[in-house]
Amino acid sequence: MIPRIMSTQHPDNYSIPFFASSPILGGEDEITEAFYAFSVLGADEQMWDFEGKEVDEFVVKKLLERYPTFFKENILGEDLRLTPRVPNPSVEKAEAKLLLETLQGITRAADYARVFYLDNIAPIFEVILPMTTSLAEMLRVHELYRKIVSLSGEVIYDVTVKEWIGEFYPKEINVIPLFETKVALLKSGRIIREYIGRKRPEYLRVFFARSDPAMNYGLLSAVTYVKKALEQVGEVEEETSTPIYPIIGVGSPPFRGGMRPENVKKVLKEYPSVQTYTIQSSFKYDHPTKDVVKAVEIVKSKKREAPDPLDIPEFIQLYEIEYQKQLKILAPYIRNIVTRIPDRRKRKLHIGLFGYSRNVGGLSLPRVIKFTASLYSIGLPPELLGLNELSDNQLDSISEYYKNLYDDLEFAMRFFSFKVAERVGLRELSEKVKEFKPDIDDEYVREAELVFRGQGDVMKLAQIRGFLG
């Protein structure tokens, strides 16, 4: 059973979950959240995010102890999955040893499951490796885990580790590469092909980011590169006869994938070859539970289809240049407003792909959810940046493979402030948006213009649009 729905801990919600002890989720609340996602919402996988977040490493023990009836009927590791996202030591030096601790924790979780199920069941047997850029990074994680397992035969003073501490299980784990940059996305097919040649896995799961590519290169480029990567994966699957199951990391706004309960059919149409779709915090908590459950059922009932073929248009580079030029103009405004965007998860001081603050084209910017929230809060949805670089014909050509392009732009344009755009020096963008004759939400835009002036209510705006960031 390969999951269709992965619940994640991305903090893009404005509502506080009913079970939360604090607006900032962490610790015990995330244990409850995992059970809620499995038992109520119908998710068949929960990401457990060790990458830059404070999470409970005894999650398996606590889930089995607190909800024994549910997990006797729904076996963790067979019917349901718990999948850690681990730090990538090639990039995250400050968190590197946490990878070792997390891999050791997999064997400990298996011990708890053995006692609970009276059987050798591995509740965790896969890890997500963020910011993957090479085959070597994947193989290192495999090899490190094998070294941990091989310790069982080592003699410590007068006894083997196996006799003293017990056997290490599972013997092998799967590594799920998470591709996040343009270069990584576009060479993902080659990396996967090499990996299959070396490891000969029964199947492979591959994770494609949608949010960070959008922040780095713009919405249209992000969709283009992710779709090209999905096409490459399909080709490798056909060549090698190895089943490959793509995962896509989608959030609520179109900029981050457009995954909202009322929009799931469009997301399925946009990414038909994806096996596993993420549902993030806004999806779970900013909508009526019945709507969330229904949307999850729609995804789980839909069969995968072939990926869409496409050629990357040459003019996409010019769009990226314009997008990044506009980011430079907006960076001071983003840094000013981001302090007003509330936290929704407990985070460590994070050293990620671009550090705690993402670095885009030499600019220091917040992480993507707060980045998105900041721009929406001043009436400049990030979906629209760089749009003025493209002609109508060029947009039409993109819409041939980006099926929801015009719907996504129409959604974002409802929250666009012509006044703010012209005030910050984005007159050309303002003129381009006017050509679409958008149906502007006047109440929203008035409040966004107040926020731009240092007043206004950013959470009122989040409620109107339906997500934080």
Curated annotation (Swiss-Prot):
Reactions this protein catalyses: oxaloacetate + phosphate = phosphoenolpyruvate + hydrogencarbonate
- Return the HAMAP family for the record: PEPcase_type2
Record's family? Belongs to the PEPCase type 2 family.
GO terms in the biological process aspect are:
carbon fixation; oxaloacetate metabolic process; tricarboxylic acid cycle
Instruction: Tell me which domain of life the UniProt entry assigns to the organism this sequence originates from.
Output: Archaea
Keywords for this entry?
Answer: Carbon dioxide fixation, Lyase, Magnesium
* GO MF term set: magnesium ion binding; phosphoenolpyruvate carboxylase activity
Organism for this UniProt entry:
Pyrococcus horikoshii (strain ATCC 700860 / DSM 12428 / JCM 9974 / NBRC 100139 / OT-3)
Describe, as the record does, how this protein assembles with itself and its partners.
Homotetramer.
In Pfam terms, one family for this protein is: PEPcase_2
The job of this chain, per UniProt, is described as: Catalyzes the irreversible beta-carboxylation of phosphoenolpyruvate (PEP) to form oxaloacetate (OAA), a four-carbon dicarboxylic acid source for the tricarboxylic acid cycle.
Any idea what this protein is called?
Phosphoenolpyruvate carboxylase
Which enzyme class? lyase
Cofactor(s) the protein requires to work: Mg(2+)
Provide the E.C. number(s) assigned to this enzyme. 4.1.1.31
